[in-house]
Amino acid sequence: MTWAAVIGSPIEHSLSPVIHRAAWAQLGIDGWEYRRLEQDGASLPGFIGGLGDDCVGLSVTMPCKQAVMPLLDAIDPLASAVGAVNTVVPSSGVLAGFNTDVAGIASAVRRACSLAQRPLPASALILGARATASSALAALGELGITTSTVAARRFGGPGSAVAAASRLGVTIEQVLWSNVEAVLQAARAVDLIVSTLPAGVADPLAQCLDVRDGQVLLDVVYSPRNTA
C-alpha cells in the first residue's frame, strides 16, 4: 500500500493525518494511507534506512527535524540554511529534504496583514530559539525583516536560531526568557510576535501583554485551537 507519515516524538497529538487526508480527498487521491509513527534520534537511522518504494513522503517534527538531515541524499538549500528539515520526499531512490515551515509562516503573516488591510510588519519578536524559530527567522527575512529579537531560555548550539542567523544573513538580538520585563518590553515594541514554544509555555507572557492595535501574533501551536 502507498503510504506517507508524520514522524517524531511524542506523535500521538499530531493532526497531520487529518490535514493530509483532507488534502488528498480534495485532490482526488484515493487508496493512500497516512500514518503517525513514533520516532526519535535513536530509532531514526534504522527507520530511514528501511524505507521502501511504497513510501511517498514524510512530515518531520521534533525531535527529528535536525537528526534526519545527515540521513538524506539531498537537502534543499533553504533547509540547509535554516538547519532543519520538516518534509522528506523519496524520488527514484533519492531521499530529499525540504523545509516548508518558512513558506507557511511567511504566508500566514502576509494573509493576516492582507485581511486586516495593514502593511507587513517591520519588526518582530520570536519566542524560542530552536528549529521552528530558525524557520521563523528565514520567513521574517523573506518579509524584509533582517533584524529580529529572539527570547529564549538558552541560546547556542548547532541547531539553534543563533547558528541559523549567521547562515541566513540576518541579525538577532538575544533576550533571556528569565528576564520577564525585558521580554515584555520587546513584545510591546514590535509589530509581529511569533511563538514557536510548546503549548502553554508562553501563557504567562500572554497574560501580561496588552496587544496594541495593528500588532500581529502568530502561535505555531494548533492544538488547542485558541491559545492565550
How would you label these PLM feature ranges?
Residues 133-134:
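N-terminal Rossmann-fold NAD(P) dinucleotide-binding loop
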Residues 2-115, 224:
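Phosphate/diphosphate ligand-binding glycine-rich loop within oxidoreductases
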Residues 9, 128-130:
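Glycine-rich Rossmann-fold phosphate-binding loop(s) that bind the pyrophosphate
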Residues 29-37, 147-149, 170-174:
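Short beta-strand elements in bilobed, periplasmic/extracellular small-molecule ligand-binding domains
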Residues 145-169:
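NAD(P)-binding Rossmann-fold cofactor-contacting core
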Residues 171-228:
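Rossmann-like adenosine-cofactor binding region
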Residues 118-120, 142-144, 207-215:
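Short, conserved loop/helix-junction motifs that constitute active-site signature segments
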